[in-house]
From Swiss-Prot:
Function: Component of the RavA-ViaA chaperone complex, which may act on the membrane to optimize the function of some of the respiratory chains. ViaA stimulates the ATPase activity of RavA.
Family statement: Belongs to the ViaA family.
Cellular localisation: Cytoplasm
Organism lineage: Bacteria, Pseudomonadati, Pseudomonadota, Gammaproteobacteria, Enterobacterales
UniProt key word Transmembrane helix: no
InterPro entries hit by this protein: Uncharacterised_CoxE, Uncharacterised_ViaA, VWF_A, vWFA_dom_sf
Quaternary context: Homodimer. Interacts with RavA.
Principal location class: cytoplasm
GO CC term, one of those recorded: cytosol
Keywords: Chaperone, Cytoplasm
Protein name: Regulatory protein ViaA
Disulphide bonds in the chain: none
The gene coding this protein: viaA
Length: 492
């Protein structure tokens, strides 16, 4: 069996030109033009897929078999090209039978060429007639091949247009929620290319609307997600440099009384010592202390300053920004995190997903209560996983140590070794084991990993929260909620 691509190549048909015409026609459809006008950021993302579309269409041409009748006619044409006029005249009846059997569109024109009025019955086929016959036959085969190509491409166009409309509809709805910049729009478009989302995307829209009504929560996510720290790197084998410092030294020439000390200086003897010399019982004590240089005398000395030059190693510190790694977010799904806390935690994760898409990062969610459930929101099926995560209910106990252990194991993966760990909880839980605490501290000191805590309650246990580098508080109490709503309404 011969493929359509091979037939086009043998007939010297430029398939790239045909594919370009298909793409231009597809992009000019009113449906796509409307979406491009409404969502311009998605247009550039869609245009980046053009090479992929063409490759997909070429692959379809490679796998599409030519109909048997067309293949049989083309084989007969190839055999007719390699024979001379006499052999062609001999095989002409068989050629006409083949054209008739395959119901070739060229049959009528071939009969007209053979039975032309200017040709007498039994006249030999000339070289000119032979060439004209083959030329017209080739043109007929080319038209049939192009027609088959267009039928196939029309089917692909309808399939592709239907897929694009679904992707554009979904991406258009999610663009205000997840597409912060051109990079995010491109990644959102790539996420929509996964298998067609079977679940309702309404949870994404609902939590996106909830996040917009909670600007303080969104701002907190921005501060956490965009926070950067610097670390100092000492230069190895630093050279030495001259270091000048002023040094105060006592002068050798006495200038003024600077204190009292023990000595044998009779000229600067204190009056109390002279009193002992006038008492006969203490006279020997005076001479003993004189010999031992223990008499209290005034200290007279001056002060001078001089510049001292020493050498020390040059120590330069390079303040380098830590690269923005992926997010690993641990979400507490215990019963105490239900209700408004649950909605805030999910909306916060959605905000981190938005930041991850904009900054070309990855976002991994781990839910912990009595077990650990995992979602990667930026994978190929990230939208599907995000919908399942947002539809998850928060019920159960709190096993934070198991989640932190799973988080540390995840950070051992080379793809996640520079991740920022975020724990969202009310931190009303049991004390963490010393083994887990030591592992966290070891990563903080040796690998400079950062651990963030997002506290949804003011009643969290300090013994748990002290292991985190940063504690971001979002009070979900009724008073704080009313204050935020009042401030939000006042701003508008």
């Amino acid at each position: 069996m011969i493929t359509l691509e091979s037939l086009e190549m043998l007939l010297s048909i430029d398939e790239n030109e045909l594919l370009d015409d298909l793409v231009v026609t597809l992009l000019a459809t009113p449906q796509l033009a409307f979406f491009f006008e409404k969502y311009p950021s998605l247009k550039s993302a869609l245009l980046n897929d053009l090479p992929h579309w063409k490759e997909t269409l070429k692959q379809r041409l490679r796998t599409t078999q030519v109909p048997p009748d067309l293949e049989k006619e083309f084989s007969c044409y190839q055999r007719s090209q390699s024979i001379d006029n006499q052999a062609f005249q001999t095989r002409l009846p068989a050629i006409m039978d083949t054209l008739s059997n395959v119901e070739s569109p060229f049959l009528t024109q071939a009969s007209q060429l053979i039975t032309a009025p200017e040709r007498t019955l039994g006249q030999k086929v000339t070289s000119g007639l032979h060439a004209l016959f083959l030329q017209r036959w080739r043109l007929s085969l080319t038209l049939q091949t192009v027609s088959l190509h267009q039928q196939l491409m029309e089917q692909e166009r309808e399939i592709l247009l239907d897929e694009l409309q679904q992707r554009l509809t979904l991406s258009g709805k999610l663009e205000p929620i997840l597409a912060e910049n051109e990079n995010a729009a491109g990644r959102l478009w790539d996420l929509s290319a996964a298998q067609r989302i079977q679940t309702d995307p309404r949870p994404l829209l609902d939590f996106g609307a909830f996040l917009q009504r909670q600007p303080a929560l969104q701002k907190l996510a921005e501060r956490l997600g965009r926070s950067r720290e610097t670390k100092s790197i000492l230069t190895q084998e630093a050279p030495k440099e001259a270091f000048r410092v002023s040094v105060r030294e006592p002068a050798t020439v006495p200038e003024q009384v600077s204190g009292v000390h023990q000595s044998d200086d009779i000229l600067r003897l204190m009056p109390t010592e002279l009193v002992t010399l006038g008492i006969s019982e203490l006279e020997y004590e005076f001479y003993r202390r004189l010999l031992e240089h223990r008499l209290l005398t005034y200290r007279l000395q001056g002060e001078s300053w001089r510049e001292k030059i020493t050498e020390r190693p040059v120590v330069h510190q390079q303040n380098e920004q830590q690269p923005r790694g992926p997010f690993i977010v641990c979400v507490d799904t215990s019963g105490s995190m239900g209700g408004f806390n649950e909605r805030c935690a999910k909306a916060f994760c959605l905000a981190l997903m938005r930041i991850a898409l904009a900054d070309n990062r990855r976002c991994y969610i781990m839910l912990f209560s009595t077990g650990v459930v995992k979602y990667e929101l930026t994978s190929a099926d990230g939208l599907e996983q995000a919908i399942r995560f947002l539809s998850q209910s928060f019920r159960g106990g709190t096993d934070m140590s198991a989640c932190l252990s799973a988080l540390l194991d995840k950070m051992d993966d080379a793809l996640w070794h520079d991740a920022d760990a975020v724990v969202i909880s009310d931190f009303i839980a049991q004390r963490l084991p010393d083994e887990v605490v030591n592992k966290v501290k070891s990563r903080q000191t040796q690998l400079q990993h950062r651990f963030h805590a997002v506290a949804m309650s003011d009643h969290g246990k300090p013994g748990i929260m002290h292991i985190f580098d940063h504690i971001w508080r979002f009070d979900t109490g009724l008073k704080s909620r009313l204050m935020r709503r009042w401030q939000h309404g006042k701003a508008y």
